[in-house]
From Swiss-Prot:
Protein family: Belongs to the pseudouridine synthase TruB family. Type 2 subfamily.
GO biological process, one term: rRNA pseudouridine synthesis
Domain PUA: 238-313
Key words of the record: Isomerase, tRNA processing
Protein name from the UniProt record: Probable tRNA pseudouridine synthase B
Active-site feature positions: 71 (nucleophile)
Family matches, as PROSITE patterns: PUA
HAMAP family xref list: TruB_arch
Pfam families: DKCLD, PUA, TruB_C_2, TruB_N
Length: 333
């Protein structure tokens, strides 16, 4: 998923009524927690479900959920959404992943031959999930964006792999060994990125516990806001569509996004892509799926732009003007 590489096309110059909603930075600490997610650095040992449960316990919320399960022995980047934020975890459902893996070959390998095979494995590959897998063992295609040798020491290699969601790193290393004719197995694995989110911005469970304690004990939420990101950040990998105030409540009720409701949007995006709906104050409304591509949206005056799949903003945050054909709000009027 591309991040930060899209242009913004303005369809309609329009302001937003300050009486409705609020910028994410204006939320109280309690509201910030309920509409947040974090980039967690999962340690080796616990399951991803256990880690999400600990987040829920630390923050005292009713639910927390993760995206992209990591096996107990695997460490690294694990996005975890909190409370209401779990409703839009699907924003990361197609997120590509980057791993650093340690592979052990069962025989000696030539470094140039290894690099050649790594190059050959880039692109579209066929994979069948391993025996111990939570999904049905069907042959499927996955894309390997890059496969790089970082270090070779005897029969041990350090590899960096950038892969499509749902790619099994362990199986990829097994296949690498088979192609080389010596066999190989994975000895260690760390996930260093999920789409735009890297280990550089990941926090630990201890960071989270400390931040929450400082807020509860001293009333200082500065650290808490650094550890817990506003839920709007979860949409970082997706094209954004900013909608008029008059369209917000309709989307909150699950209606599709119609062209007259669009104020501006990021492009390019294609039909079928996930898109994120935002208010003009920068609040995340929900996630939809584009019914047309961005070039068509530029010219559209009527018709449907996207189907609404998930909503995070509560109904009634903005008035239901869509029921009575509400007027737009102009800046300075």
């Amino acid at each position: 998923m591309k991040c930060g590489s899209r242009e913004v096309f303005v369809k309609l110059e329009e302001g937003t009524n300050p009486q409705w909603g609020k910028p994410p930075s204006s939320r109280s600490a309690e509201e910030h927690i309920r509409y947040s997610f974090l980039i967690l650095d999962k340690p080796r040992g616990p399951t991803s479900h256990e880690v999400a449960a600990w987040v829920k316990k630390i923050l005292g919320v009713e639910r927390a959920g993760h995206s992209g399960t990591l096996d107990p022995k695997v460490s690294g980047v694990l996005p975890v959404a909190v409370a209401e934020g779990t409703k839009v975890l699907m924003a990361l459902s197609r997120a590509d992943k980057v791993y650093i893996a340690v592979a052990k070959f069962h025989g000696d390998v030539d470094v140039e031959n290894l690099r050649r095979v790594l190059q050959e494995l880039q692109g579209e590959i066929y994979q069948k999930p391993p025996l111990r897998s939570a999904v049905k063992r069907q042959l499927r295609t996955r894309r390997v964006y890059s496969l790089e040798l970082l270090e070779l020491d005897g029969r041990y290699a350090v590899l960096k792999m950038h892969v499509e969601a749902g790619t099994y790193a362990r199986k990829l290393i097994h296949d690498l060994g088979e192609i080389l004719g010596v066999g190989a197995n994975m000895r260690e694995l760390r996930r260093v990125a999920v789409s735009c989110f890297t280990e550089d911005e990941a926090v630990t469970l201890q960071d989270l516990a400390d931040a929450y304690y400082i807020w509860k004990k001293y009333g200082d939420d500065t650290y808490l806001r650094r550890v817990l990101l506003p839920i709007e950040e979860i949409a970082r990998p997706l094209p954004k569509i900013w909608v008029r105030d008059s369209a917000v409540d309709a989307l909150c009720n699950g209606a599709p996004l119609a062209a007259p409701g669009v104020a501006k949007f990021e492009h390019p995006f294609s039909r079928g892509d996930l898109v994120a709906y935002f208010t003009l104050k920068g609040e995340l409304i929900g996630i939809g799926r584009a019914l047309v591509d961005s070039e068509e949206v530029k010219k559209m005056e009527k018709g449907l732009v996207a189907r609404t799949d998930r909503v995070v903003m509560p109904r009634g945050t903005y008035p239901p003007m869509w029921r009575r054909g509400g007027k737009s709000f102009k800046s300075g009027t």
